[in-house]
Amino acid sequence: MALLRGVFIVAAKRTPFGAYGGLLKDFSATDLTEFAARAALSAGKVPPETIDSVIVGNVMQSSSDAAYLARHVGLRVGVPTETGALTLNRLCGSGFQSIVSGCQEICSKDAEVVLCGGTESMSQSPYCVRNVRFGTKFGLDLKLEDTLWAGLTDQHVKLPMGMTAENLAAKYNISREDCDRYALQSQQRWKAANEAGYFNEEMAPIEVKTKKGKQTMQVDEHARPQTTLEQLQKLPSVFKKDGTVTAGNASGVSDGAGAVIIASEDAVKKHNFTPLARVVGYFVSGCDPTIMGIGPVPAINGALKKAGLSLKDMDLIDVNEAFAPQFLSVQKALDLDPSKTNVSGGAIALGHPLGGSGSRITAHLVHELRRRGGKYAVGSACIGGGQGIALIIQNTA
């Protein structure tokens, strides 16, 4: 048993993911989390007053009120004023980390019911001018910094995230054609899952304003299901000459949020919640930052070891698709079964709003595991700076 107490997921919802500068661009990360949290509270029949803690992961802090994010989410959805809130940042693992931190609070009996979430509005990432607060020298050429682009570069190793994926492509002999074929598969699997309604249980529709008036958004906006291999092959590589990473086989810059409500076994019984899944275990691992994308390998292995399970026990595996060569390197290193890995597509198709992806992956695994009648699933993400995080869940149906 990897956890000291039984911890159960009693609700798991996410917003549709918006394209960069798309339908969700005017919603802050706080707004997006509020939508997901309200949907989760409603779906799980969880009264807000039963929430003991609010934990939300967010990376870019792109809105002016971002410092208050988790607190504002809690207050907006009716969580008692006396209940504390925490906004955390483990980069692309932040959505997963919110659940991990929630489990830790429950296991230490600091909380019984925790509203967890992950969120990002990449569209709202501002441009900034640094070092002007105390005046500038005559003639100084002020530089306008794109905080989004700057945030996707690891200054410690002086590499943009895309180059760490190129390093993995070289290390694991991943070709450009491999990457484009995988990107096409991600789009096609997303299309099939979307048309079959496999995202319906996790989705929290949002009313958005368009040129044609208000409409309900309930489908991921970034996905390009009509993409062909020929189109992908024509795209130029972005980070190095004759490289593998293109705009078509990398995760999409996007906006979105997810909310996962977890509760102790005692709380499930006390409040008569319906458990959807049990949190079996988790693991966080560091790795070489120049190949940060390999992080899911030690993370998944660590989580499985703690839980006394193996990859063969997993009915579903979901590894965040930061870049196609990154995912393919993880797949090769772990010898993942393609038939049960990223079965509904991933971030290459639907986008990767940094803090939101862990919550999205968890929500999808919860509902997809139940739909398929499977037992175990593991979700994982690589993390900029050289980390990996993994979370194992068990179907309770």
UniProtKB/Swiss-Prot annotation:
It is found in: Mitochondrion. CDD domains: thiolase. The record marks H352 as: Increases nucleophilicity of active site Cys. Residues 1-16 form a transit peptide. The keyword Hydrolase applies. NCBIfam families: AcCoA-C-Actrans. This is 3-ketoacyl-CoA thiolase, mitochondrial.
